[in-house]
């Protein structure tokens, strides 16, 4: 059934919004995995876990915001399977933050591509929506993660090879306590 409210909302944009919803849900799922990995008793970096769990919630909220847009514009939400995170064991904070940065850059590129599609289809409402709710936040988050990576590389020292879960170094512990503290 076609929507009675649909106006200036192309099927290409509608499909791209559905793909972006899926990317946000996949990011949320990955951050949830990261968050609870770092909260495990054998990892015990609660601040890192909290940081990633907050990101999981933000990405889920972003998916919901996109779904609301889809309904407001007369589009139809088509849910797709959400891909599981690429791994279950995340190692050290440095490797996890690198994976998170790559994920955010991928998500940002998808947002930029959708914005370009909206511009090409003369959809100012979509472009304004993305600019107001997503693009600036993404750039700030990418910068924040880049800063965290710089500091993690500064404090990382050579680690002896271990079996099982990599143990946090003193530098990683201090980064977690001083940078990602939460109350």
UniProtKB/Swiss-Prot annotation:
InterPro entries recorded: Ferritin, Ferritin-like, Ferritin-like_diiron, Ferritin-like_SF, Ferritin_CS, Ferritin_DPS_dom
Cytoplasm among keywords: yes
Binding site for Fe cation: 54, 57-58, 61, 64
Keywords tagged on the record: Cytoplasm, Cytoplasmic vesicle, Iron, Iron storage, Lysosome, Metal-binding
Location relative to the cell: Cytoplasmic vesicle, Autophagosome; Cytoplasm; Autolysosome
Domain characteristics, as noted in the entry: The rat light chain has an octopeptide insertion after residue 158 compared with other light chains.
GO molecular function terms attached to this record: ferric iron binding; ferrous iron binding; identical protein binding; iron ion binding
Family annotation (SUPFAM superfamilies): Ferritin-like (SSF47240)
Tissue spec. comment: In rat liver, the light chain is the major chain.
Gene Ontology cellular-component terms listed: autolysosome; autophagosome; cytoplasm; cytoplasmic vesicle; ferritin complex
UniProt record similarity statement: Belongs to the ferritin family.
Domain Ferritin-like diiron: residue ranges: 7-156
Species this protein is from: Rattus norvegicus
GO biological process: intracellular iron ion homeostasis; iron ion transport; response to lead ion
Protein name: Ferritin light chain 1
Role, per record: Stores iron in a soluble, non-toxic, readily available form. Important for iron homeostasis. Iron is taken up in the ferrous form and deposited as ferric hydroxides after oxidation. Also plays a role in delivery of iron to cells. Mediates iron uptake in capsule cells of the developing kidney. Delivery to lysosomes by the cargo receptor NCOA4 for autophagic degradation and release or iron.
SUBUNIT field: Oligomer of 24 subunits. There are two types of subunits: L (light) chain and H (heavy) chain. The major chain can be light or heavy, depending on the species and tissue type. The functional molecule forms a roughly spherical shell with a diameter of 12 nm and contains a central cavity into which the insoluble mineral iron core is deposited. Interacts with NCOA4.
């Amino acid at each position: 059934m076609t929507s009675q409210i649909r106006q200036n909302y192309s099927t290409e944009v509608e499909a791209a919004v559905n793909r972006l919803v899926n990317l946000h849900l996949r990011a949320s799922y990955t951050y949830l995995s990261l968050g609870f990995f770092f909260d495990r008793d054998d990892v015990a970096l609660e601040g890192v876990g909290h940081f990633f769990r907050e990101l999981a919630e933000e990405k889920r909220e972003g998916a919901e915001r996109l779904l609301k847009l889809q309904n407001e514009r007369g589009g139809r939400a088509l849910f797709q399977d959400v891909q599981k995170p690429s791994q279950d064991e995340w190692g050290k904070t440095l490797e996890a933050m690198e994976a998170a940065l790559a994920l955010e850059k991928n998500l940002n590129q998808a947002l930029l591509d959708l914005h370009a599609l909206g511009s090409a289809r003369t959809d100012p409402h979509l472009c304004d929506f993305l600019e107001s709710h997503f693009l600036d936040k993404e750039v700030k988050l990418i910068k924040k993660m880049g800063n965290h990576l710089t500091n993690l590389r500064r404090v990382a020292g050579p680690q002896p090879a271990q079996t099982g879960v990599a143990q946090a170094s003193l530098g990683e512990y201090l980064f977690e306590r001083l940078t990602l503290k939460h109350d």
